[in-house]
Amino acid sequence: MNKLEKNKKVYNAIDYGLNPKNKDNSEELQTLINLVHNNGGGVIFIPIGVYIFDSAKSSWDMTKNITAICEMKSNVSLIGESLTDTILKVIGNTEKGSALFCHNSEFSKEILHSATAKNFTIDMSEASLNQYTHRGKAFYYSGIKDCVFRDLRLISTPSTALGIDMLDNVVIDSVYIYEGGRSWNYGGNGGAGIGIGTGLWENENYVIRNCICVSCGHFGIFLEDQGIFHNKENFPKGQIISNNIVRNCRHYAIGIRGGDTVLVSANNIYNNNGGLYVDYGARNIIFNGNIIKSSKEAAFCIGNEDKIINNNSKECENIVLTGNTFIENKINLLKDSEHLSCIEKNNIFIN
């Protein structure tokens, strides 16, 4: 607390109505977020405890595609007292799912900025939906700058756990995700551990590092150009996915759908249905120094998923696969490998 207070005004959430004894803390937290934002910004400090958020009671439709519990505002940071013992627990049944923290730049008429989330757990294992959609996330932001997501645990989200789109100068660091996309089935949208939609700016610079994604649905980590839904190629430049662990995912570990100038390096990927994946005309993508082990499908795949979506068969360009290690992958090492521009100095064992 004292260290935080040197930089920004700190609001102890307990002093503003949040309480582990409450049956629903949604209204109290939203009121506090609004207060901090209107006062010029600061830190909401959440002490140790389990805080309930009732999605059945407190969800509301932000847009026709987004159902929210709390709306995040600029210059408001959330920091917990304990990574494992400050728990925001979402419960309740909704028709299509709802997200605990939402922001949409078209709805709010502003880009979200300076909103850090750090050192707490979001547990959605008791939140359910009747019809699977992409809505049931821990974080659901669109249009954000200058934000940090660090030291978080995101548990059993029905849809993507950290589903944040259109990022610039954003760091995602040391986030543990278990069962992101718990309710996802093949053919559904979203359902990843970390899912980043791209395509608002020419340069969308962000880093995903030191994260652990376990038993996720569609992908462990997934970058997706949103032009695919409008038959366009936006392909913003400049992302890094590095030093992450992805295991036991039901589809592929790391996927790049569209995009330009992406570095995927030094990731430890094992026991997934598939390893690395690119499609929708992605270009200038470098996969370097990754370990891909015990994939049930391809350890590396170029573009054969969902071709019915606006010509997803667009050919990828300048895909580089170098310095990776492939171990005991059961089926294909490569699919459509003729599109690779460079394959060199990879290690292959017992494939």
Name these PLM-found stretches.
Residues 13-45:
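Acidic Gly/Asp/Thr-rich repetitive segments characteristic of extracellular carbohydrate-active
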Residues 310-351:
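Leucine-rich solenoid repeat scaffolds
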Residues 74-76, 113, 144-148, 166-171, ...:
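Short "repeat-start/strand-capping" segments in structured domains, especially the N-termini
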Residues 109-212, 216, 220, 225, ...:
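Right-handed parallel beta-helix
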Residues 30-39, 52-79, 87-118, 124-145, ...:
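Extracellular beta-strand-rich solenoid/capping regions of secreted or surface-exposed proteins
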Residues 41, 55-57, 83, 89-97, ...:
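Short glycine/acidic-rich loop motifs that flank beta-strands on beta-rich extracellular proteins
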